[in-house]
Amino acid sequence: MHKIVWFGTLNKSIGYIGKKKTCLLSPCEKICLNSARKTVQRCDKNYSPPKLRRIKNFYTYSVVLGSLFSIVMWAIYKLGKPEEDHRGPIEDEFSQLPWFRQYIMRMWHTLQYYEKMMEEPQMARLLPNVVPPPYIQPPYSLVLEIKDVLVHPDWTYQTGWRFKKRPGVDYFLQQCSRNFEIVIYTSEQGMTAFPLLDALDPYGYIKYRLVRGATDLVEGQHTKNLDYLNRDLSRVIVVDCDPYTTPLHPDNSLVLTKWLGNDDDVQLFDLTAFLQLIAEHQVNDVREVLRYYRQFEDPMEQFKDNQRRLQEQSQESIQNLPTSERQWNLTLLGRSLRGSSIK
């Protein structure tokens, strides 16, 4: 009597090998057959029939879509429900609309409000009013950016992010605080800027600190609107390394070359001399001076070149004076050079 033995795989991609009609198996053949069956079972564990896969995908998509639908409905309810007081819901301009449309319109109005909050400064006046006499109000306001003007961010694998202090920062702040109201106005977050300024200015030369929340968001870029400063713009100087941060007031900006962290930088010392000349000459409208230097790629280098040429011209004029008058003019020359024409 013959015994029919079936062996194959459940995997349809492989298919059945077929059937074999054999006699009774020997012990060795039984061992081989059992081994083959175990191998087939192990291969079939990860196999999912197409119908089962479709069911799994259906449930996955259903859960995702259901979650998204729940979130959207919750947002419509939370942002679109009417305000209430002790007497119940308060009527507004959407109260006469159909119920569902009321919620949609209120939600849209709320989202526009939050978008406007993000794009505009938090306050219409970023600085308090100038102090009245007998208190002393500096004649000019100096608005500074932090990044690449006073410090430079540096990252290494060993230390992570660090900020390198620019050469001459202490001297610059100390000298400018005599004639300028120093204001930090940066697009950096407050959690970054405030600890950095605490370490950078231990003596309190910086009077006010304005961070990202005080900027305007225009086409994805944080800009500085000087109209909110509550200061006379004819006496406001903005020092930055990005010409696009003050698009509404380019004549108030002195755009320096970006500091990249080099130790031989002397630009803050040159800037100190430039600002001291403005204060010493009591310039009525700083925008005229800044407009002139805005045409140069490196305004501080042009300023130094102008000062050298002025000094040479002054020395030539002194040499042409009679000997009796030279000593008297040399004394005035020292003062006139320190207070020489800025241009």
From Swiss-Prot:
Subcellular location: Mitochondrion inner membrane
SUPFAM superfamilies linked to this entry: HAD-like
Expression by tissue: Exclusively expressed in the testis.
Quaternary structure note: Component of the TIM23 complex at least composed of Tim23, Tim17 (Tim17a1, Tim17a2 or Tim17b1) and a Tim50.
Keyword Iron-sulfur: no
Transmembrane parts of this sequence: 58-77
Keywords of this entry: Membrane, Mitochondrion, Mitochondrion inner membrane, Protein transport, Transit peptide, Translocation, Transmembrane, Transmembrane helix, Transport
Physiological role: Essential component of the TIM23 complex, a complex that mediates the translocation of transit peptide-containing proteins across the mitochondrial inner membrane.
Entry membrane topology: Single-pass membrane protein
InterPro entries reported for this sequence: FCP1_dom, HAD-like_sf, HAD_sf, TIM50
Protein name: Mitochondrial import inner membrane translocase subunit TIM50-A
GO molecular function: protein serine/threonine phosphatase activity; protein tyrosine phosphatase activity
Major location (coarse): mitochondrion
Side Mitochondrial matrix, residues: 1-57
GO BP annotations listed: mitochondrial membrane organization; mitochondrion organization; protein dephosphorylation; protein import into mitochondrial matrix
GO cellular component, one term: mitochondrion
Tagged with keyword NADP: no
